């Protein structure tokens, strides 16, 4: 290979880990914070379910470590690229990607922990000797730093790059979401922030050249790892060397025996009863009479009667109840033990068996590794950002452009549904939940709501059905064996003693892990104000 081309590929490879390895230890926190805290997912005895997360929680520790690792890696690569011997176009593209990922990491940090330190340049921090005494920076300043970082990323990035890589419109989509989130930070919604969220999201919708995929479930298939709808994604590699390059979510989320590697243990957790309520269905309803008009339900949670043509393709598809109750078909599986206490198991973040993985990517999966991409910012999210932001300070709108964005998302999910001619804030709020369920995002909607209406966020979380059903297996086994659907309400019922979670205003800010505080005791002190645009520059 010619030296110049070799250098080009070396630079591209150099920034590639930002799409996977530093994020690895956030995978569990991504689900536990984003989905269990928010009431979308049930996991028995989880501190994220009952709001008792403490400073030694392993998943919280790993989450924080991962997010700071992303920032450190992005800073290092960005600094080195500035003096690399390569074309300005290549350097700018890669530097822009570094800044976009850095902004994403800070976006997770500020929404999770509130005020956090700003690490602008690793070398400067090390040379100063103050890296373990940094003060937290006020959340408003952190948001301004994120905005500043994304503005520079947009300046550097091409309008359209290699498929699956971040381009200018991807960064702009994130910028729109940042402005929407920031809009309520002061305690009341800021009209200017909402206007900017609408402006940036509309530009992405109109000018990025990207479209929603026609079929919702296709977004999450292996063959579509790099698709036009996904603006930011973790692109994993199917292997264990080095460890951290791979997707391990199937192990945590799938039922035992779902693949042939003996690495699945997620059957006793799953999408919550409350999320089923949001979709307008119930685990107590017969599959033959269940009102299943929203295609996102089946693409998000598997329930009695569901069969998936994209899982277990070498066996004619994956039959949910057959897998549980037919020991020959479901070898290594639950063997007649219905595990889910909610009547649903996960679909998103699963690739299937090894044959499915080979068909999708051309390479094998293995024990605790796959190459299935994890999408963390999608175009449909930006459509809904626009619909909400376009309302401004109002609680409803008949604006046609907002309706078009909302109806595009809803219309894909529910074929043939009548388009809405007016939408409320509540419509968009619910649509976001259904569209992005189990994608690590819902908790952060509650965080931004709590910025300006904490009581509403608290009331909604307390009213959720976050508990379990009893004896679902009795009904499901009979239905599988003889087609009879009978529910004895004295036996098969939702837990009548379920208690509301202890949600308070402080619940919307996670505690810093002990390790972080030991390393930097100033994390326990009040944050400081920093004029980030004067203090930092790119």
Task: Enumerate the predicted regions with their spans.
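An aromatic- and glycine-enriched ligand-binding surface/loop that stacks and positions planar moieties
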Residues: 1-40, 143, 151-152, 165-331, ...
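Conserved, well-structured interaction surfaces
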Residues: 5-10, 41-113, 134-144, 149-163, ...
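Long, intrinsically disordered, low-complexity segments
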Residues: 67-68, 145, 220-275, 281, ...
